[in-house]
């Protein structure tokens, strides 16, 4: 049907060729003799020769090929990079830094993938292409309807083109000479009478078994042939129509056989699938029944367990509520009895108070006064006891620290400090004094605190070094030290005390005099006022003297505060 239409269109287009020319600047165009029309050969029983093959076209640029090659190259490079990343740490760092798309999934596939996974993916892809459904009868009907509509559209377009060609032919006798010169050369077609073309008919054995869609297609072909007969441009070609008729009969028989084969195959597949579906349905029904029975028994057991648990909880709650109500009732009875008893006792007491116990309030006031007196007396006794204990502890500490006996063994001081700390918890001054005293004598013994006599003897031992140090010049070297030692032997000791003397002999004399009189604070002050190397030599002696002064002051403070308590 399509071939006939295209050929008729070509013949209609080949009837005339119009050439036009224009008139420019009012110059008459050259008169060109009209070309001789080609001889029209009557179409008889001979088949026209096939058209010449089209010339080979030069290969053009293909966007699809370019995109395909580019995509293939990018895929190979990307996959090679990810594979190299699994083998090289530097490439892996590059991939992670650049955050290439889908690099984690692809690297995991490269590292953990196997041939079994590839085979499974290939089978899935293969199943997608093999599970192609055969075209159904409805699909075939739809295809034939589309072909029929397309043929009708082509017929309509052909008729329109033929009508336009007839309208375009206009006689040139009515035109002026100028218009005839300006008008293009026209070629008149030679018309011939064409006999009616034979219609397409099916064989008698295929007429009943052919589908309705094929019959409709044949009808449309016959309509098309009749339209060609009605046209004045058609030529007679019986062999072509006969070949078309034969081809249509063959197509009808082929379609009939394909339809029968398709129906038979469809019936066989339907039977097989029905059997398989019935067997699978039976198996699934049995499995579903077993699962339902199992679930039913499981749910039944769970419901029984939950029901028993709920009943036991409700029974326990009821028992607890009943026992609580009973205990509340008993408690209320006891409270009521207690109230009645208290009421009875209060009534009896009021009777006795108004009678024999009339002076009970006065006796109660006297007892309260006695209690207050006893509390005050007890407080005074406790404070006196504390005073006595503090006096004893302070006296013991003074005797051990400030005036120890030569034959006594050294004893730790910490137990006495702990005893004072326990007693002096209520007084803030005592607590602060003991707190300052503890770090001074906690790690000391009874013989580690130097007495005045020991300090005096140490000062006398330190005096020659102080004399030699006073003779040292600034930044003295070894020779200066040797010279100071020699010259210090030549110094004569000063007798008496010079109150205003600032030389080393005056200072040594004042310190010895103060230690002899028991004025340790003045002696420590004189030694602390030394300068230079002499002060560094006397530093240890000053530290020991200050420690003794601090201990004496804190013990005196504790003793004075204990008298005020």
From Swiss-Prot:
Keywords: Coiled coil, Membrane, Mitochondrion, Mitochondrion inner membrane, Transit peptide, Transmembrane, Transmembrane helix. The keyword Nucleus does not apply. It is found in: Mitochondrion inner membrane. The chain crosses the membrane at residues 63-85. Residues 1-25 form a transit peptide. Component of the MICOS complex, a large protein complex of the mitochondrial inner membrane that plays crucial roles in the maintenance of crista junctions, inner membrane architecture, and formation of contact sites to the outer membrane. Plays a role in keeping cristae membranes connected to the inner boundary membrane. Also promotes protein import via the mitochondrial intermembrane space assembly (MIA) pathway. PANTHER family: MICOS COMPLEX SUBUNIT MIC60, MITOFILIN. Component of the mitochondrial contact site and cristae organizing system (MICOS) complex. Belongs to the MICOS complex subunit Mic60 family. This is MICOS complex subunit MIC60. It comes from Candida albicans (strain WO-1).
